[in-house]
């Protein structure tokens, strides 16, 4: 039986990968890091501070990830974790060289769709070999009958990036490039965010990979920067949480217009360590749905918790203290590998 089986973002969770903060660092400043992550924060890539995150940040985050894993285990979920890796090691191709980033966000580089798991062609050079952290798991899933695909490795030359372009146009269409976290699963409908972490060719490649069973919906002018899971959050069939600073009547994906849309309330700014945060305050709506009536939510976001409870959701309140520093909340820091239902939904 395939150990990979996921059709959407809400069916009861059976197996999940929880990331690790061990060894996390800001990679060497290069054109990819500047264009994708920091073009709006610094005038040149030379200004970007790189190197290891403070030990305190990593220690506290790893402890909180352990708590998350333990709580999910109590709920009967099988939890898998990557082992430690040396992210300071050099990564080199004929076109460039850099060092690594982290394995904190398995959501960013692996996409599970049905019984298929896909290694996506990520936008940052520092994440070029990130899937190696999960190689043993991928082999195990493959042995169980899962379909294992790896997108063509992008060259990620300087031509792939336009750091001086407006936000949303800094990743060019030289070749298919996208992070898995640019995708949300709604049964046979896949929402694909066209942004600085996912280009048009990436959407075209994904459609060819998943075949005619699925429809990839490229969403443009929804959110310019990286990843979609703090912009639109599916809670259960027919109910979606949206970011009021990004989603409006004009850019709401057509296939979601019939859904009940609840607007995320103002969030608590949890702060960050260092000169610049890696993500905005909206990381507070980056939640993990465990089943249609239960979600893991940042305990500090009390207004959001009350809103979810009002709409019939129970909440498991946990905390990732440094989510703005490291760039990921509970959805980012996990990858759902298997959910109970075998039914696919088409809306």
Swiss-Prot record:
Keywords carried by this UniProt record: Antibiotic biosynthesis, Streptomycin biosynthesis, Transferase
One GO BP: streptomycin biosynthetic process
Coiled-coil positions: none
TM segment ranges: none
Catalysed reaction, written as an equation: 1-amino-1-deoxy-scyllo-inositol 4-phosphate + L-arginine = 1-guanidino-1-deoxy-scyllo-inositol 4-phosphate + L-ornithine
Role: Catalyzes two non-consecutive transamidination reactions. It converts scyllo-inosamine 4-phosphate into N-amidino-scyllo-inosamine 4-phosphate and N1-amidinostreptamine 6-phosphate into streptidine 6-phosphate.
Record family assignment: Belongs to the amidinotransferase family.
Protein name, as recorded: Inosamine-phosphate amidinotransferase 1
Organism the protein comes from: Streptomyces griseus
Gene: strB1
């Amino acid at each position: 039986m395939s150990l990979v089986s996921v059709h959407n973002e809400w069916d009861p969770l059976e197996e999940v990968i929880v990331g690790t903060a061990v060894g996390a660092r800001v990679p060497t400043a290069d054109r990819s890091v500047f264009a994708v992550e920091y073009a709006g924060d610094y005038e040149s890539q030379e200004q970007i501070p790189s190197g290891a995150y403070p030990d305190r940040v990593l220690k506290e985050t790893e402890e909180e990830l352990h708590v998350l894993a333990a709580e999910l285990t109590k709920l009967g979920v099988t939890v898998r974790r990557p082992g430690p890796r040396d992210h300071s090691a050099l990564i080199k191709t004929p076109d460039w060289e850099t060092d690594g980033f982290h394995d904190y966000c398995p959501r960013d580089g692996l996409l599970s769709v049905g019984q298929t798991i896909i290694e996506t062609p990520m936008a940052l050079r520092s994440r070029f070999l990130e899937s190696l952290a999960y190689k043993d798991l991928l082999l195990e899933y493959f042995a169980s009958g899962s379909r294992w695909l790896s997108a063509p490795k992008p060259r990620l030359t300087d031509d792939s990036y336009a750091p001086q372009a407006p936000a949303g146009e800094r990743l060019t269409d030289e070749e298919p490039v996208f992070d898995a976290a640019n995708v949300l699963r709604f049964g046979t409908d896949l929402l694909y965010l066209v942004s600085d972490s996912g280009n048009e060719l990436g959407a075209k490649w994904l459609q060819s990979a998943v075949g005619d069973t699925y429809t990839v919906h490229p969403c443009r002018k929804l959110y310019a920067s990286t990843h979609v899971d703090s912009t639109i959050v599916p809670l259960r069939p027919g109910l979606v949480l949206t970011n009021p600073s990004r989603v409006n009547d004009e850019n709401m994906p057509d296939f979601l217009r019939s859904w009940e849309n609840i607007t995320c309330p103002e969030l608590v700014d949890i702060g960050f360590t260092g000169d610049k945060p890696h993500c905005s305050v909206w990381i507070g709506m980056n939640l993990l749905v465990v089943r249609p009536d239960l979600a893991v939510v940042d305990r500090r976001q009390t207004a959001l918790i009350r809103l979810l409870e009002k709409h019939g959701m129970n909440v498991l309140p946990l905390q990732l203290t440094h989510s703005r520093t490291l760039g990921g909340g509970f959805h980012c820091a996990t990858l759902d590998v298997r959910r109970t239902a075998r039914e696919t939904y088409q809306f």
